[in-house]
Amino acid sequence: MAEQASSFTDRLAARFAGAQIAVALPRGEVTLEVAAADWHATCLALRDELGFEQLSDLCGVDYLGYGSDEWDTADVSSQGFSRGVEGKAVGRFAWGEFPSQESSAGAQPQQLPKQRFAVVAQLISYQHNQRLRVRCYAPDEQVPVVASVTDIWPGVNWFEREAFDLFGIVFDGHPDLRRILTDYGFVGHPFRKDFPLIGNVEVRYDDERKRVVYEPVTSVEPRVGVPRVIRDDARYETAAGEVGKSETAK
């Protein structure tokens, strides 16, 4: 599998020479990283020239707080979770907290990505029996924008709408870019790392008004249910070595 992936990597590097593209082989998989300006043209070439006729999934990623943990597990501790945990995300212990890039004592912080928001597409070539992951970072985290690929793979329509709804990533050229999962009038994007875990409003039925009303959240206190933990694990060693195996097409 690794030999096949390496050969495929060489083909990608040769085809996209001159483009801002990085090719990596984590866990025997092939990941193609492309600049936002080259996103649409690269996807079109992958379909028409390399036979990736199927896009099986597309999602957004928010890297805010990437590499930070909330519970030091580097050494054995006599402290339980309630005494040892450190909240570093929005709405974990108090409102207004912002995700941190710090790590617990004894843990090495992971390398931060290039930008906060990214779009990741999973492609399949049935004729070549090959899978490919394509990643693109949005250049502006205030208003993340990448080109829509609905004209290349029409089935991506709802995937892009979902990424827009949950992460606020704008897909330029999408024929019908509107929310798909959240309620009418929803404020914010719930999969962003700086979105409160319990939301901004709560719903209840008002007996006097005889209808459902939305009010600011007051009945729920912020708390950590499951801590975010980063451990040394052999399953992730190849991911950590991804940078060393990466190459940039020239």
UniProtKB/Swiss-Prot annotation:
GO MF annotation terms: NADH dehydrogenase (ubiquinone) activity; NADH:ubiquinone reductase (non-electrogenic) activity; quinone binding
Subcellular location: Cell inner membrane
E.C. number(s) listed in UniProt: 7.1.1.-
Protein name: NADH-quinone oxidoreductase subunit C
Gene Ontology CC, one term: plasma membrane
Subunit structure: NDH-1 is composed of 14 different subunits. Subunits NuoB, C, D, E, F, and G constitute the peripheral sector of the complex.
The keyword Cell membrane is annotated on this UniProt entry: yes
Domain of life: Bacteria
This protein's UniProt keywords: Cell inner membrane, Cell membrane, Membrane, NAD, Quinone, Translocase, Transport, Ubiquinone
Enzyme class, UniProt record, top EC level: translocase
Cited Pfam families: Complex1_30kDa
Signal peptide range in chain numbering: none
SUPFAM superfamilies found in the cross-reference section: Nqo5-like
Protein family (similarity comment): Belongs to the complex I 30 kDa subunit family.
Protein function: NDH-1 shuttles electrons from NADH, via FMN and iron-sulfur (Fe-S) centers, to quinones in the respiratory chain. The immediate electron acceptor for the enzyme in this species is believed to be ubiquinone. Couples the redox reaction to proton translocation (for every two electrons transferred, four hydrogen ions are translocated across the cytoplasmic membrane), and thus conserves the redox energy in a proton gradient.
Organism: Xanthomonas axonopodis pv. citri (strain 306)
Membrane-topology annotation of the record: Peripheral membrane protein
InterPro entries: NADH_DH_suC, NADH_quin_OxRdtase_su_C/D-like, NADH_UbQ_OxRdtase_30kDa_su, NADH_UbQ_OxRdtase_CS
Catalytic activity: a quinone + NADH + 5 H(+)(in) = a quinol + NAD(+) + 4 H(+)(out)
